[in-house]
Amino acid sequence: MKKKYYISISLLMTIIVLVFDQVSKWLITISMKVGDSYEIIPNFLNITSHRNNGAAWGILSGKMLFFYIITIIILIVLVIFYIKEAQFNLFMQVAISLLFAGALGNFIDRVLHGEVVDFIDTNIFGYDFPIFNIADSSLTIGVIFVIIALIKDAIINKKEV
């Protein structure tokens, strides 16, 4: 019988992402100055110490109150979505846990430091992508998983009609 909620898996996923996110950011802040960069994979991956007080690409830079309010709303909405829409669906619960962990990881940075620590610096197919962190990766993967889960549900529901 399928469980309604996989709370232990969801909590474990959230905690693992948060720990990796916060520890990696702490290591960057104690070992690198802002702007320092180390090439890991030539022309593809650098570790670059960067701070961001906005969103991706510096959008809404300095609008901390906005980010505090929006993040709290998003975290509440994610909990409600988890309870109401993710019942019996482990994949959706993992997706929401990734979203929650990513949002919370960057929220912690904003509250404690007034900015987010970014350090993953990639060059993908010649495009110098904005520098990001593990929380951002968790958010991106969570969004992709939610889309996959919604498409899968739509296909299953269409077959049942």
Swiss-Prot record:
Pathway info: Protein modification; lipoprotein biosynthesis (signal peptide cleavage)
InterPro entries: Peptidase_A8
One Gene Ontology MF term: aspartic-type endopeptidase activity
GO cellular component, one term: plasma membrane
Uppermost EC category: hydrolase
EC number: 3.4.23.36
Family statement: Belongs to the peptidase A8 family.
UniProt name for this protein: Lipoprotein signal peptidase
Organism (species): Staphylococcus epidermidis (strain ATCC 12228 / FDA PCI 1200)
